[in-house]
Amino acid sequence: ATLIYTSGSTGRPKGCVLTHSNFVELSRNSAEALKEVVAKPGASTLLFITTAHVFARFISILNVHAGVKTGHQPDTKQLLPALGSFKPSYLLAVPRVFEKVYNSAEQKAEAGGKGKIFRTAAHTAIEHSKYVQEGRRVPFMMGLKFRLFDKLVYSKLREAMGGRIEYAVSGSAPLGERLGHFFHSIGVDILEGYGLTETTAPATVNLPGKSRIGTVGPVLPGVGVRIADDGEIEVRGVDVFQEYWRNPEATAAAFDGEWFKTGDIGAFDKD
């Protein structure tokens, strides 16, 4: 179906052979796992990532499979204006996009002489989310400040993002708990996932209503994940690539039987 080269961060880039089956099966399974996001009436999303990236290519196919309205805006400088006009119901992006949204809002507040208010509101949002995620009772004064900042700050940021976004899926790099908590509190649940070019993008992803900030969620249907004795993450299933293009030595070294050796270290938690 396609040939996508790895980033080459640990050596020369290698061409990953990904098949129609990789994309179709993973899209079908992901659409079911994320049905609260992609099957919602009027679902739409705006992509900022080049389709040379496996994540954007996978999402494009997922959206066709799920019947999602999809827009493209390659110029990240036009990010907020594009969100405001397109009004997506969810976003799929890399962490730098969420960082840009946050930084743009902070810079706008600073320019308007409201930088201190924004920073205090951001701190309140992050602390509030931590209480909620941990199932602890939110202190009265924190709850009061949160409701006040929701009217003064958070609601305006939601409106700047189009006013309809409930979920966002983040991949390709760690999001960072601070950003995750901030967006969670303002009403945008970021579902962080894990995957590589070799796994057609996602192997795991947090699910709506069950997301845990700082984790990459459960394994997607049709995918298997195990942790080797040395802590390395290994993946098998419908998402795993066929081979490295014209590089049988690298292909052989990348597999332990049917298991693809990611080169990343990970662990399972109690869930």
What are these regions (language model features)?
Residues H20, L175, H181-D189, L196-G214, ...:
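Active-site loops of AMP-binding adenylate-forming
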Residues I126-E192:
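Non-catalytic, charge-rich alpha-helical accessory subdomains
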Residues V24-L47, T51-K151, R164:
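Conserved AMP-binding/adenylation subdomain of ANL enzymes
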Residues T6-S9, T45, T50, L91, ...:
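Conserved S/T- and glycine-rich ATP-binding loop of Class I adenylate-forming
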Residues S21, R96, A173-P174, D239:
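Alpha-helix/helix-capping structural signal
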Residues V219-D271:
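Conserved ATP-binding/catalytic segment of the ANL
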Residues A1-S27:
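Conserved AMP-binding A3 loop
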Residues L26-E32, K100-A105, V169, E177-H181, ...:
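Adenylate-forming
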